[in-house]
Amino acid sequence: YSPSNPVTRAQMATFLWRAAGEPAPMGAHGFTDIPPNSYYETAVTWLIEQHITSGTSPGKYSPSNPVTRAQMATFLWRSNCPPAPPISALAVGGSHSCAIKEDRTVSCSGRNTSGQLGNGTANQSLSPTPVTGLADVTTISAGLQTSCAVKSDGTAACWGYNASGQLGDGTLTQRLTPTPVAELTDVTAISAGTDHSCALSQSGTVSCWGANGNGQLGDNTLDGISTPKPVPGLSDVTAISVGDRFSCALTSGGTVFCWGYNVFGHLGNGTTDQKLTPAPVSGLSGVTAISAGAQHACAVKSDTTAVCWGDNSGRLGNGIIDRSSTPTAVSGLDNVKTISAGVKQSCAVKLDGTAVCWGSNAYGQVGDGTNEDRLTPQPVSGLTHADTIGTGSFHSCALKQDDTAVCWGANYNGQFGDGTNTSRLTPTPVFNV
């Protein structure tokens, strides 16, 4: 038996896997130093799926390395601790993140200087903290310093920064806990941006509120308002997305309208002129999903390809850095399920459950194990079985098909919710403490 011999990481993986009953893993491990068909390959794959280990460095498991006492303790604790509570939806904000749990309550983590975590304090939290008094939530959105949620009865609530009235409660008062959005009773979706918010009604109409210095409320004025105001001329809307001082809407016919700030061409109408009312995105039809970032936007088409427009520096994914005021195809990307535009990065989930990201990567928000900016889509390292994806200022997160979540990029404020403020170049399990 060789009881005095040191235990390798390969052997430890095998011990744990066999102790669990040799379960069959669903996906792939993503490591380059695991020989195919090795005695420990299945065990390591299972460890990855159970979030017991993420390797020693990007793409490396180091199977021959001895297991330290610290690693042994961590392996055993993670293999025996209760699983993370299921997550039904994930929202990624500027430097915070929020999740809807199986019981339809909400928890948030990360930066909290304006109360965007909704827990009654202004203290940041490295671990998920429950949003006070919020239940029966169906959908959620995280903005730069605000958060908003829709409840099953069609009402909405927001919390956090409110200097422009973006919480929609008729005041400019910052809120540390959820406050009802005035006058809304039939909401199906909500989107929080930098200084304004918009909501979609069951009837397919849109209302917006907050700052309006660039026409982002779409009401043909530049007057801000702290309660919801209908966007005229929009009907049959199926999805909305709010960015930095601009808004976009997708209609049932597959067309997209955007309005507001446009200095980078991110309204997609071929100009850089701001629009006070919704304007169609040029040459775009057959759209199934949209996402508005800080100064760019992206869409998924019915043929499962993706396009982006606006400011670039890599975030359009077309291989160049020049901005575009009309939609441009994301290079080499097809079989797209959903897409998310962040501040300077974009990410997409493919139909096979893998994910890709592109754009600025200074904080590792592309998730490819490097800090190199990417002008075209790059696979997110080791991520399989992804369902949805979200992008913030400098971090990105994905909700997986097993209702667990992973994040990568900047974590200085604890926005991962993993109990640390350690940033990551590749996905790490989150909202699990």
Can you describe what each PLM-predicted range is?
Residues 4, 76-115, 119-122, 128-129, ...:
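An edge-strand/N-cap motif at the start of beta-rich repeat modules
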Residues 56, 110-127, 159-177, 210-227, ...:
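Short glycine/serine- and acidic-residue-enriched loop/turn motifs that recur at repeat junctions
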Residues 92, 100, 139-142, 150, ...:
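Residue-level recognition of a conserved intra-blade site in WD40 beta-propeller repeats
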Residues 96-99, 108, 146-149, 158, ...:
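Conserved core positions of repeat-based scaffolds
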